[in-house]
Each structure stands twice: as C-alpha cells, then as structure tokens.
C-alpha cells in the first residue's frame, strides 16, 4: 500500500470513528435538562478549553500561527463555525416543529446536497460506484428512519427546517474540507467552536427553557456532548476531511442513525426490528461502495500524466 492509500485509509477510519462518536450527541441531548439551543451552545463552549490546550501545544499549529495567516484562512475557519451554528440551530428547531423521524431523515439529505454542491461549484465528478453507494446509503437511512416518518401539513415548517439543516451541514462539510487544506485540525476546531459559541449565545439566552444546568449531575450530559461528541468525535471527522473527499465524508456520516438507534435500544429500551437491520445493512453497503468509488477517483487522478506545457 503506497503512502497516498495509507493516508486515505487512515482518514476514512477517522471519519467512521468520528461519525460513531458524534452519534452519541443525540443521547446526551436527550439526557440534558437545558433548552436545545443552550445544549448546542454548551457543547462548543465546554469544548473550547480542551481545544485551546490542543492548539497551544500543537507544534504545527504554533508554526502556522507564528507566521502570517492569510485572511482567507481565517475567514474559512470562521465560515466552518457559522455553518455549524446554522446546522445546530436549524436542527433543534426542526425537531421542535416536526417529528424526530422526519427531522432526522431530512437532515441526512446533507449527503445529496454535498454532492450537488461539489459538482456545481468545484467541478467534482463521481464514479458509478460512488453514486450507487450514495443511493444505497440514502435508501438505508430511509428504511431505518422512514418507517416512523409522517406526512402532514402541520409538519411543513419543521420539514423545511430539516431540509435547511441538510443544506447547512453540507456547507459545514465542504467548508471544513477546504479549511483543512491549509489549516491544522486544532486550528479549525478551535476557530469554528469559538465562532459557533458566539453565534448561538444570544439565541440560547432568549429561547424558552433552562440555560444553566440545575445541578452537578445535570452538567454531565453536557460534558459528554462537549468533550466526547465534539472534541473527540468532531475532531476525528475534521482530521479525516484533509484526505477524504467531502462527498465521501458526508455519505459516511449516514452511519450516525444506525449508532443512535443502537444506543437508544441499549439505554432506553427502544424497539429494533427487521427494518432497522435492513436499513443498517444498506447504509453499511452504501458507505463501502462509495468508499470504493472515491478511492478509484483519487487513484485515477494520481495516474493522470502531467502536461509538459502546463
């Protein structure tokens, strides 16, 4: 295995592990006693001290900060935070205005929006294997979640917010991938978390519900949200996006509903049936097929001869 393939495999494994880790966010949110937007605010705010320590003692980050960062690099890192803030805020309101199943299913359309944006704005082309994997994974998500979805005019606002969530998360993935082209993982994570916290704070303060946890025990789910889901899980995804195409990253994140369903079954005794198993298998098959297609595209690009006139 050459160096490029090793980097790809390592990055893909990081994205998978990160996706599995951030699936716990839904469980921590459910255990929290603060308002949804407050939970999103505390998620990034509690992550900031650990991210700062990481940034402070990371040699590559110090070297880049010690030099002159270009404005585009700074704005890109801030853009990651803006897209993430939009994603979290829209997602929470979507859940409030429609069913959890509808909101989750529509948010998973981020994989489609990522692929469309990559094609329209960055000229990315996709192999049949990748497109087949995308369709399989989406079919799996629909099978896993769709049996609990509902079609009703009273959910139209929430459903539209669910689609908006998908657009925001697609923007987050694409901008994060571009940021990782010139910035380290801790730089992207700290800059985006700080931006997200600043954007969400006023919304968290004016939203109905609890802002501060009422007891020490009530802080524990928020610490899990900030330290495990965000610092550990989200950092793995950001790390992986330096070597894995954003489109493959977005498809891989479809593993989250599978893990969330397993955690809900284990912790809350929520029922799992045949359709859940079928959906999970389709998602796994789709991810592996998309991985194969993305890897083929990368290898083909490396093998293209360089024009001597360029």
Annotate the PLM regions.
Residues 38-49, 92-125, 165, 246-265:
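Specific alpha-helical transmembrane segments that line the substrate/conduction pathway
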Residues 23, 45, 81, 85, ...:
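Hydrophobic/small/kink-forming positions within alpha-helical transmembrane segments
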Residues 21, 58-101, 107, 115, ...:
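Specific transmembrane alpha-helical segments of multi-pass solute transporters/efflux pumps
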Residues 51, 55, 117, 126-147, ...:
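Hydrophobic transmembrane alpha-helices of multi-pass small-molecule transport proteins
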Residues 1-42, 47, 51, 79-82, ...:
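Glycine-/small-residue-enriched transmembrane alpha-helix faces in small-molecule transporters
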Residues 10-14, 38-56, 129, 133-139, ...:
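Hydrophobic alpha-helical transmembrane segments of multi-pass integral membrane proteins
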Residues 44, 218-220, 228, 254-310:
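C-terminal-most transmembrane helix of multi-pass membrane proteins
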Residues 19, 103-109, 176-197, 230-266:
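Helix-helix packing/entry segments at the starts of transmembrane helices
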């Amino acid at each position: 295995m050459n160096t490029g393939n090793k980097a790809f495999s390592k990055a893909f494994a990081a994205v998978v592990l990160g996706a599995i880790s951030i699936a716990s966010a839904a469980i921590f949110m459910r255990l929290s006693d603060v308002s949804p937007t407050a939970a999103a605010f505390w998620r990034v705010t509690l992550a900031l001290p650990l991210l700062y320590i990481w940034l402070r003692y990371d040699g590559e980050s110090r070297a880049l900060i010690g030099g002159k960062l270009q404005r585009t690099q700074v704005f890109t890192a801030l853009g990651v935070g803006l897209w993430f803030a939009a994603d979290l805020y829209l997602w929470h309101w979507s859940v409030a205005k429609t069913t959890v199943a509808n909101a989750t299913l529509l948010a998973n359309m981020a994989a489609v929006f990522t692929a469309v944006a990559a094609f329209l704005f960055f000229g990315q082309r996709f192999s049949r294997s990748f497109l087949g994997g995308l369709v399989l994974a989406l079919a799996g998500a629909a099978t896993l979640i769709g049996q609990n979805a509902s079609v009703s005019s009273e959910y139209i606002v929430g459903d539209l917010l669910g689609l908006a969530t998908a657009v925001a998360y697609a923007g987050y993935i694409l901008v994060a991938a571009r940021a990782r082209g010139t910035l380290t993982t801790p730089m992207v994570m700290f800059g985006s978390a700080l931006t997200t916290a600043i954007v969400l704070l006023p919304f968290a303060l004016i939203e109905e519900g609890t802002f501060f946890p009422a007891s020490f025990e009530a802080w524990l789910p928020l610490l899990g949200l900030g330290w495990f889901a965000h610092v550990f899980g989200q950092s793995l995804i950001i790390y992986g996006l330096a070597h894995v195409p954003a489109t493959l990253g977005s498809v891989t994140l479809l593993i989250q509903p599978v893990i969330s369903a397993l955690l809900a079954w284990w912790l809350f005794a929520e029922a799992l049936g045949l359709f859940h198993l079928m959906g999970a298998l389709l998602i796994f098959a789709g991810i592996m097929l998309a991985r194969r297609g993305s890897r083929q595209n990368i290898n083909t690009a490396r093998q293209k001869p360089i024009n001597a006139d360029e």
